[in-house]
Amino acid sequence: MVAAAVAAAEQVVAALREECATPAARLDGVAAAMAGEMAAGLAEEGGSKIKMIVSYVDNLPNGTEEGLFYALDLGGTNFRVLRVQLAGKEKRVVKRESREVSIPPHLMSGNSSELFGFIASALAKFVADEGHNAVFNDRQRELGFTFSFPVRQTSIASGTLIKWTKAFSIDDAVGEDVVAELQMAMEKQGLDMRVSALINDTVGTLAAGSYYDEDIVVGVILGTGSNAAYLEKANAIPKLEGELPKSGNMVINTEWGNFSSSCLPITEYDEALDKESLNPGEQIFEKLISGMYLGEIVRRVLLKISLQSSIFGNLDQTKLKTRFILRTPDISVMHHDGTPDLRIVAEKLADNLKITDTSLETRKMVVEICDIVTRRSARLAAAGIVGILRKIGRGVPGDKRKSVIAIDGGLYEHYTEFRQCLETTLTELLGEEASKSVAVKLANDGSGLGAALIAAAHSQYLN
């Protein structure tokens, strides 16, 4: 009986292992498909599954910026206001203050002027606290605005809202320029401040990295969601209208989460997850690699095992059938369990899923499932990065330039197995020689610091 139950469970794991396999040849295919989709998205609007949004950021901060700059980070039920004092190459960020403010629920579905009025009044209070040290000499204060909702950007400091996501539904803001709305609200507060850049958090990650390291060419977010932005040559963007920027460069926000390709290793669990999601058929790459979904994929595998095998004993499946009850931090803790009897795995299974009295053999199987799902995610993320590097001719044999990738997000920062797998996969795909010139760096707070730095790099007072 026991042997049959174990064999049935092992069959499920063996099938998962095979379906999630990411040999180098397959990952090379993913990288090539990513580079191809990128080129198609740059050629024309709507030319690709990935949007390849022109950010209008043509200068990245390089450490020489000076002065006091502000940032507003709006992306969820809270927003953040931030103030940074920059003192050039030698001292960099000399002071940094921030404040987080909760948005009252009624404002998230009210009207536009109420929401932006509330934000502007919080900004005005924050500015009032800056003390006597701030010398503006009749200069306007400048702000970088991180707005983490879909926008059709029309210039560095203007963009119309395409639609709200998360818990927001303010109909009269859709189709309006969010910068103009904020600017108007600030004027009503008597606040003399100019929005000098509208960005998204991934562009901010690239900027925050680039401020400390001028070799950074790609910014990636690997957290609850996933995205990448990178520095492209402006003359390689056929859809870019008007004259090319003086710098010759343009930051592109890829929106790579929506990438999909026949090269991707997709299982029955991924297909079911996608079908039951709020956006079926969309964000396929993100659903394979981001922190929002890894725990949920593992839960679905465990549920199948419980249906095909009695390995978990006499189990009430209520918890195991609850979507998203297993989060990525939970699988990370199980994956990193170093106790000889995998005690932490036993505790997690009991606490989260009411799976009790597991054998050591069963717990090892659970760790293996976490490993299979996480390795696939990390290796696919690495292949995506290699696709971007190849698109811009970096990290290829003969290229001696140093290329650094700035990565932000809890999945990369806190999930050690994920991070190590991503880094070794990069080396494997780039090859020993080329990988010597490619490095990965953690870059924190693109949405706050990054926005303030882009405001500084695009200040109206620069010569």
From Swiss-Prot:
Residue positions annotated to bind D-glucose are 165-166, 200-201, 227, 255, 286
Its GO biological process annotations read: glucose 6-phosphate metabolic process; glucose metabolic process; glycolytic process; intracellular glucose homeostasis
Q: What is its EC number?
A: 2.7.1.1
What does the record note about the induction of this protein? Down-regulated by glucose or fructose treatment in leaves and immature seeds.
Which gene specifies this protein's sequence?
Answer: HXK7
Record Pfam families: Hexokinase_1, Hexokinase_2
Per its record, what are the GO molecular function terms? ATP binding; D-glucose binding; fructokinase activity; glucokinase activity
Q: What is this protein called?
A: Hexokinase-7
Matching Gene3D superfamilies: 3.30.420.40, 3.40.367.20
> InterPro entries in the record, alphabetically?
ATPase_NBD, Hexokinase, Hexokinase_C, Hexokinase_N
Task: Extract the ranges annotated as region (Hexokinase large subdomain).
Answer: 200-445
UniProt lineage: Eukaryota, Viridiplantae, Streptophyta, Embryophyta, Tracheophyta
| Localization of this protein | Cytoplasm
Q: Which reaction does it catalyse?
A: a D-hexose + ATP = a D-hexose 6-phosphate + ADP + H(+); D-fructose + ATP = D-fructose 6-phosphate + ADP + H(+); D-glucose + ATP = D-glucose 6-phosphate + ADP + H(+)
Q: Name one GO cellular component term.
A: cytosol
Q: What does this protein do?
A: Fructose and glucose phosphorylating enzyme. Functions in sugar signaling via a glycolysis-dependent manner under aerobic conditions, but its signaling role is suppressed when oxygen is deficient.
Q: Does the keyword NADP apply?
A: no
Hexokinase small subdomain as annotated region, ranges = 62-199
State the similarity comment.
Answer: Belongs to the hexokinase family.
Q: Which residues form the Hexokinase domain?
A: 7-456
